[in-house]
């Protein structure tokens, strides 16, 4: 990863943590109907994984009936991704970064307060209509997209997948994938390039807050 790549990723993390316009204009799993139809079409020709996808579809349906489609579950999933990211950051760096972000927030729970505030921004996005997601997941295109993006997450970012998979939250990942991309990219970078490169990224984030 080049210095320019680190700078660009640090900028996106800072913007995600500090500004509301980071999320504005972003696509999401509900509105991108073209992508849903694309995954539906791909599912028809992807005969090699038909058996495994059939099992995954059963998991989707069971998860829906257990109430997975809700804003609270989306917020929980995003919060877990923040937690993975924060586990790799030293206590001193977390204290410095989150105290700068917190503004009027005070007390010993500053980090959790900032994380929850950012998670709610994503979970409460106007276009994240859980009713539409519920019926969409029962249909073909959105269900296929959910399964394929979960599979991609498992391959590209197994640490995040493992954490979300515990409660089937990986099936919701496609809804907010773009919004949390700076965090998942940083987590993946740490796994690929090591803690030294990750710490260098965090130094850049700290200097930009």
Predicted regions mapped to residue ranges:
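Membrane-engaging insertion elements
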Residues: 5-51, 75, 128-187
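Organelle targeting or membrane-anchoring low-complexity regions in eukaryotic organelle proteins
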Residues: 10-15, 104-112, 205-209
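Charge-rich, solvent-exposed alpha-helical interaction surfaces
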Residues: 9-12, 29, 36, 63, ...
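C-terminal assembly and membrane-engagement modules of membrane-active proteins
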Residues: 173-209
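Membrane-inserting effector segments that mediate pore formation, membrane fusion
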Residues: 92-149
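Low-complexity, intrinsically disordered, cysteine-poor segments enriched in small/polar
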Residues: 25, 29-36, 40, 77, ...
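Mature extracellular/secreted ectodomains of secretory-pathway proteins
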Residues: 38, 42-107
């Amino acid at each position: 990863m080049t210095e320019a790549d680190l700078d660009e990723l640090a900028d996106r993390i800072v913007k995600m943590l500090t500004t509301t316009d980071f999320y504005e204009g972003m696509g999401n799993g509900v509105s991108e109907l073209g992508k849903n139809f694309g995954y539906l079409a791909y599912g028809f020709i992807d005969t090699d994984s038909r058996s495994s996808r059939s099992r995954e579809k059963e998991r989707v349906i069971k998860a829906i009936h257990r109430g997975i489609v809700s804003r609270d579950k989306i917020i929980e999933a995003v919060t877990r991704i923040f937690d993975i990211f924060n586990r790799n950051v030293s206590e001193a760096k977390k204290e410095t970064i989150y105290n700068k972000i917190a503004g009027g927030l005070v007390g010993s729970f500053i980090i959790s307060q900032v994380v929850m505030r950012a998670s709610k921004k994503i979970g409460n996005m106007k276009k994240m209509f859980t009713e539409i997601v519920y019926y969409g997941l029962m249909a073909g295109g959105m269900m296929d997209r959910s399964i394929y993006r979960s599979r991609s997450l498992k391959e590209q970012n197994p640490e995040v997948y493992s954490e979300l998979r515990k409660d089937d939250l990986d099936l919701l990942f496609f809804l907010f994938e773009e919004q949390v991309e700076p965090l998942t990219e940083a987590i993946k970078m740490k796994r690929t390039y090591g803690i030294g490169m990750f710490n260098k990224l965090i130094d850049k984030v700290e200097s930009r807050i």
